[in-house]
Amino acid sequence: MASQLVMYEEEFTKINAVCDRLTKDANAKVVFLVDKNGQLISAAGQTQNIDTTSLASLTAGNVAAMGGLAKLIGEAEFPMQFHQGNQLSLLSAIVGSRVVLVVIFDNRTSQGLVQLRVKKASAELHTIFDALVKKADGPGSGSPFAEISDDDIDNLFSE
């Protein structure tokens, strides 16, 4: 993400609902939504035994590294990546060049079903983030600190 995005409660609730629904619809163990800076936005499913901070950071690093590889071969990016393990597999998808949707699943589901459900969830998330950007760019959406001057801060901390 080029700049920090302000998250409003309404959109945050919608994002969590999409992640919860994806967990159920794809029969996934865990779903994460991470921004490209490595900040965890949402998590759904069996997250108890996962270091979510590390997962978010490593996801962002992986997207950056794969973006570099994509450019080397003439691609803009690899919008979807799949990593298959013995017990668990991981599918990640870039959503609207802003965030990364990460799905961890086992053999109770198939890669095809997960990809299908991720495409649907990605479209929903793209719509939510577009609305969020418009809301943040709208009138009266500037920083709440923009009108505070250095004098105001000095006065606040003076006796």
What is the predicted role of each segment?
Residues 2-28, 37, 41-159:
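Acidic, low-complexity cytosolic segments
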